[in-house]
Amino acid sequence: MILSQRIQSLTASPIRKLSPYADAAKAAGKKVYHLNIGQPDIATPAQFMDSVREFQAPVIAYSNSKGEMFLLKAVQKYYAEKGMDYAIEDIFVTNGGSEALIFAVMALCDPGDEIMVFEPFYANYTTFCKEFGAKINAVPTSVENGYHLPSEEEIEKHITPKTKAILLTNPGNPTGVVYTEAEQDMISRIVRRHNLALIADEVYREFVYDGAYRSFGTMPELDDNLIIIDSVSKRYSACGARIGCIISKNKELSKQVIKCCQARLCSPILEQVGAAALYTTPASYLEEVNKEYKKRRDTIVAALKKLPGVKASDPKGAFYIMVNMPVDDAEKFAIWTLENFAIDGETVMFAPGNGFYNTPGSGINEARLAYVLKSEDLERAIYILGEALKAYPGRVEK
């Protein structure tokens, strides 16, 4: 058979593509500390499995393409409690936040159109765009500025006739940046001035450790431009449930998104049952989880500061941190570490940073670390990382 150029143009995920090396290390008897993926180790609330066990149905039948009403109402109530008034008609259940993003790109872009992002950015955005022939229009940010946005003038320089949307992750993955209200107001002006869509990926909104957080959904002037992407994956430590949603008050968008939902038939009914139950989780659960991640953030930042030649960002939210390392190539270093380095039978895995950039050559000596392990495991993992840096043949002294 002859495969399409489109599928061959897709890039492997920097988060998962080194998994064969980690699997080989484990097969050789090594313990691998996984800092490469945002898979929380915090227990999923018991409500999820309890509700699934209690679910009674003679047949596991197709569910509503838009999502079951009990879940739609649970999502609606969650947003209402946060000051956002969405109608049931504005909410569509998806197979994770990833499918919500795919639907957004499909609804907005024809081949050759552009989605503006701020790099470094979540690596799968590139794949979601390429699947539909759309392009990433990447605007650089810097660690020196905490990965905050460039000026309004600088952003507008990058807008072209093909630009259809601005896609923001807030809080940021992989940077941990939390945008200020002034930055949000600036983005609001830009998208309305140029009649762009604003795709707000807010799946980490519960994880903010310093200062306040404002959802784009609380800005009524954006009602016609805004598409919110959400998910239960990180919020409730339910990544494998694959339940998310796409939300917008734009009625024309809603008419088109339902076609996508119908084409893939439905989201899994049992996962919808469990997800609806997660929305009944007491606020105290998220408060405790937030405290735990703040502790882990503080742990990894302190540990990284002890490593000579390593520069790290100061994340304010989510559970990721970008680090600049004294190496010739972070991907080569990651492979070398998994294949050739261990301390007492233990090694570490991380995501090479170049996969979070669109600009060729950027991020070559950077890595994204996910601080989703217990603090003592993070300290051990960063110690191993530091010792590996000392031993790595491709170390570059700065």
Q: PLM features: residue spans?
A:
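Short, surface-exposed loop/turn segments at secondary-structure junctions
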Residues: 62-63, 287
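PLP-dependent class I/II
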Residues: 3, 11-13, 18-31, 37-55, ...
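Short beta-strand to alpha-helix junction loop
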Residues: 66-67
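Glycine-rich loop-to-alpha-helix module at the N-terminal edge of alpha/beta enzyme cores
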Residues: 35, 58-62, 74-77, 81
